Amino acid sequence: MKLILTADVDHLGAVGDTVEVKDGYGRNFLLPRGLAIVASRGAQKQADDIRRARETKAVRDLDHANELKTAIEALGPVTLPVKTAGDSGKLFGSVTAGDVVAAIKKAGGPNLDKRIVRLPKAHIKALGTHPVAVHLHPEVDVEVALEVVPQS
């Protein structure tokens, strides 16, 4: 089944891309969720317009992503105080991407979307310094040193 994506889909493509998928995936997942439309001549012209606009926007986004990268790198290590379970150094919960975004903002950094934060594992569950990747743009990634410390 040939479809045109109306939203970014992980491991498949970006908005405006024409993709070939299995019928069941297209009919049961992509189309009902509004992530794609069936490819036709009119839809293809619309996809070309979307792609041109996306390429223009990508240049502006790349400049903005580089500015954000500079601002985040200027912060240095970001500290996140959390509740711990005794002296063992384990946490009562876990540190999520939302917690990382809040810590970056509190440290004076830009407001980010939690979906662009890539934790080293699913969640951070111990004290210490952990590298956290922030995916700002397909060409721009920045690594933040997150210091998880016990709350006083």
Curated annotation (Swiss-Prot):
Domain of life of the organism encoding this protein: Bacteria
Keywords: Ribonucleoprotein, Ribosomal protein, RNA-binding, rRNA-binding
Keyword Repeat assigned: no
GO MF terms held by the record: rRNA binding; structural constituent of ribosome
A biological process term (GO) from this entry: translation
Membrane-spanning residues: none
GO cellular component, one term: ribonucleoprotein complex
InterPro entries: Ribosomal_bL9, Ribosomal_bL9/RNase_H1_N, Ribosomal_bL9_bac/chp, Ribosomal_bL9_C, Ribosomal_bL9_C_sf, Ribosomal_bL9_N, Ribosomal_bL9_N_sf
PANTHER family recorded: 50S RIBOSOMAL PROTEIN L9
Family in the record: Belongs to the bacterial ribosomal protein bL9 family.
Function (record text): Binds to the 23S rRNA.
Name of this protein: Large ribosomal subunit protein bL9
